[in-house]
Amino acid sequence: MKLLRSLALLAVATAGLSIHALQAEPLKIGYSDWPGYTILEVAKQKGWFKDAGLDVELVWFDYLPSLDAFSAGKIDAVCVVGTDALVNGANGAKSKIIALLDYSDGSDMIVGMPGINSIKDLKGKKVGIELTLVEHLLLLKALEANGMKQADVELVNTPTNETPQTLASGKVAAIGAWYPNSGQALKNVPGSKPLFTSADAKGLIFDVLAVNPTSYAQHKEEWTKIVGIYYKAVDYLYDPKTHDDAVKIMAAKVGADPADYAKNVPGTHFLTLKEAKAAFTKGDDLMSVYGSMTIGNQFNLDNSVYKESQKPASYLTPAIVNSL
């Protein structure tokens, strides 16, 4: 009896340790230098996750490595372009898109060298972009708007964080990049200019919070709080009384000058909770994430990013946003 009682107590103690260990494991969110992701740093610095009783670890990455980490199961969630969430899913890492963070409103750019004054001037010339990512999609939109097609330019596959140096080298006539890389490219090459930006195609590029389905199912209460805190950070940025503090925090995270960063903030349309609810409404146009991601899915298919069409509606999970 004494042995049985000891074994029973050991089992209870072990179970208790397991539960504690499970609770002690933080929810890991991958984020990178896009402003719509970097704003999470505001929530971290202000202690809002801890105030809500949450154990959240924000893990800083370059953009593509953050997608790889999510695919490998090293993080619970990732801040990502909606189109790229489909790529991860097609490769086996399905996700639940539980929050819409922003849409690009000018910070994604096709930047031309001095003497290149329009998209039409790029005919027959080299353009440095990271193939199959959002700048590739933006370039195709720019070409289409100017009566051109991809075959009219020569694409040079260039990691986005290397585009400022590539433009400065003079080896290409233009590059495609998002902020802060787009801003750095303009600064590195006097006389360079934006030829086409995401402000010319609002809603083409939605950024989202994509969560591992198992983590979502097991921690829905925590994810609900996290989503609420994200929109609290957006409100903090938009509030004139706290705007400068938010910008200072975000700029410091990416090593940018706060004044320069502030000038570029409008290029990202951070979604308020109300706007996120509206964008989660089903529709065919770009201002509905359903319509936007349908276009992104077709882009991925056309460029052989994956072979089997993905269904955006199977990823989009508006329940948390609609409950707030």
Predicted regions and their residues:
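Pocket-lining segment of extracytoplasmic ligand-binding domains
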Residues: 82-84, 156, 162-258
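Sec/Tat signal peptide C-region and signal peptidase I cleavage site
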Residues: 17-24
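Bacterial N-terminal signal peptides that target proteins for export
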Residues: 1-8
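Hydrophobic helical h-region of N-terminal Sec-dependent signal peptides
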Residues: 8-17
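Secondary-structure end/capping motifs
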Residues: 217-305
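Short, glycine-/small- and polar/acidic-enriched structural segments
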Residues: 25-166, 173-179, 195, 203
